[in-house]
Each structure stands twice: as structure tokens, then as C-alpha cells.
Swiss-Prot record:
It is an enzyme of class 3 (hydrolase). It comes from the Eukaryota. The keyword Transmembrane helix applies. This is Lipid phosphate phosphatase 2. Its main location: membrane. Expressed in roots, stems, leaves, buds, flowers and siliques. Its EC number is 3.1.3.-.
């Protein structure tokens, strides 16, 4: 379907109507935020860590290359900025609303899944020894040889949240969604062989991958944690994107489903109006004959 500019369908003219139509979706987003907060507050499962298991958990405890506060900037703010730029170019409130809604769902659903698994699995991080024994002196149960941590409670708690990587899953959820969004907008799969378009689409995924690599380099995660986080984030991003947009390889992949539904409704209204006018003319002709 050819692209048609919708100059009248802006935030000011139709924003409230579109948002109200999806009010239940926004309420679900609020519920996901509450669930995410709860999952971060509760205590994760403290998996058994024997004395002989600490051989692989003695990596140094160090700061994050990418701090926690930077993850929302990478996963949410950056894609949000790109979506807003496209809105100012096209002035399509349907695209703006559905892209933002899809992005937020992608990140929040990923966050809930990630933290739920973290709390349930309780896998120790590679630097767990130094979290558990900051003075370097290990203390173990006489019978089971399980660790008896002397470190700060919050530090030890965080040490049981290795799998999967939250940095990685969030990054792939947000930037994966952005990659799909750009794929549709610049028509990467139009079969014209423009590899430059493909490079643009791969760039967000590369950034997400580098975030994952930094988690292994910082000894905050095992490689399996990063791989699992990437799979979760990218899978959720794909499902959330397809909920609002056609696949990027579709000829209509440049616009949201709501855009094409609006066009169909507009055509039906025009046809109904034309039919009513034709009927009115026929009635007038009949009356004049009489």
C-alpha cells in the first residue's frame, strides 16, 4: 500500500482519542511497573554454594562499566528519541503512540521475566566470593560446607542474581525493538540490495551486544547469563513489535496496523457517504418524475 501523509492525525488532534482507545494497555504497563518493583525488593533464592564451588566464583569485585542508571537511557530513551524524530517528520500519531507503547511493553515485559527468573534461580555471580567474604576469609557450615556469608546483606543479595543478565535483556529489548522499527521505516527488505540499510539496522543490535560483553568483562555475569538475557530481550521485542506493526519484510511494514485500519475505515465512510448521496439523488429524481 502506498504511503499517505496524515497531516491531520497529530498528537493535538487525535492523541487523546488514540490513548483512550488503548487505556487498558497503559493500565497493564502500570501493573508491570509494580510487579517489577516487587521483584527487585523480594529476596532471591539463595542457591547452595559449597566450598569447592568457589573456585569459579573468585573473580574480582569491581564497578560496572555501564552503570545501572545508564541502562534505561540505552534501552528506552535512545529508541524513544528516534521514534519522536520520525513523528516530527511524518506527523503520524498512530505510529508515535504504537511505537512508544510497544517499546515500553518490550522493556517492561522483559524486565519482569528477567527478574522473576533471577529470583527463582539464584545463580551466584562470578565475583560471589568477594561479595560473601569481603575480608577474603571464607567461613563454611561444618556439615554441608555451604557458605556463611559475612558481607553486607544487599551486596550478597545482589550476588545471587546472575542469571539472566538484566543489562543485556533490557538492552536487547529496547534496541532490538528499535532495530525492527528502523527495518520497517527504511524498508531494509525491499529486495533492492541496499546493504547500507542493513548496517543501520544492525547498529542497535551491536550496541546491545557490547553491553552484554561488558557484563562478562566486569565479572558480574557468566557468558550463559548474557546469552540468556539476549534471547529473552530479543524474543520479547519481536513479539511486542509484531503486535503493533507488520513484519519489516512486509510491503506495508513501514506503518502500524492502526494506520491501515484507519485508512480502511475512512474508505468505508466515504463509500457509505457516496451511497447515501446517490440514494438521495435517486429519490429526488423519482419525486420530480411524479
Amino acid at each position: 500500500m502506498p504511503e499517505i501523509h496524515l497531516g491531520a492525525h497529530t498528537i493535538r488532534s487525535h492523541g487523546v482519542t488514540v490513548a483512550r482507545f488503548h487505556m487498558h494497555d497503559w493500565l497493564i504497563l502500570l501493573l508491570l511497573i509494580v510487579i517489577e518493583i516487587v521483584l527487585n525488593v523480594i529476596e532471591p533464592f539463595h542457591r547452595f554454594v559449597g566450598e569447592d564451588m568457589l573456585t569459579d566464583l573468585r573473580y574480582p569485585l569491581q564497578d560496572n562499566t555501564i552503570p545501572f542508571w545508564a541502562v534505561p537511557l540505552i534501552a528506552v530513551v535512545l529508541p524513544f528519541a528516534v521514534i519522536c524524530v520520525y513523528y516530527f517528520i511524518r506527523n503520524d500519531v498512530y505510529d508515535l503512540h504504537h511505537a512508544i507503547l510497544g517499546l515500553l511493553f518490550s522493556v517492561l515485559i522483559t524486565g519482569v521475566i528477567t527478574d522473576a527468573i533471577k529470583d527463582a534461580v539464584g545463580r551466584p555471580r562470578p565475583d560471589f566470593f568477594w561479595r560473601c567474604f569481603p575480608d577474603g576469609i571464607g567461613i563454611f557450615h561444618n556439615v554441608t560446607k555451604n557458605v556463611l556469608c559475612t558481607g553486607a546483606k544487599d551486596v550478597v543479595k545482589e550476588g545471587h542474581k546472575s542469571f539472566p543478565s538484566g543489562h543485556t535483556s533490557w538492552s536487547f529489548a529496547g534496541l532490538g525493538f528499535l532495530s525492527l522499527y528502523l527495518s520497517g521505516k527504511i524498508r531494509v527488505f525491499d529486495q533492492r540490495g541496499h546493504v547500507a540499510k542493513l548496517c543501520i539496522v544492525i547498529l542497535p543490535l551491536l550496541v546491545a551486544a557490547l553491553v552484554g560483553v561488558s557484563r562478562v568483562d566486569d565479572y558480574w555475569h557468566h557468558w550463559q547469563d548474557v546469552f540468556g538475557g539476549a534471547i529473552i530481550g530479543l524474543t520479547v521485542a519481536t513479539f511486542c513489535y509484531l503486535q503493533f506493526f507488520p513484519p519489516p519484510y512486509d510491503p506495508d511494514g513501514w506503518g502500524p496496523h492502526a494506520y491501515f485500519q484507519m485508512l480502511a475505515d475512512s474508505r468505508n465512510d466515504v463509500q457509505d457517504s457516496a451511497g447515501m448521496n446517490h440514494l438521495s439523488v435517486r429519490q429526488t429524481e423519482l419525486e420530480s418524475v411524479r
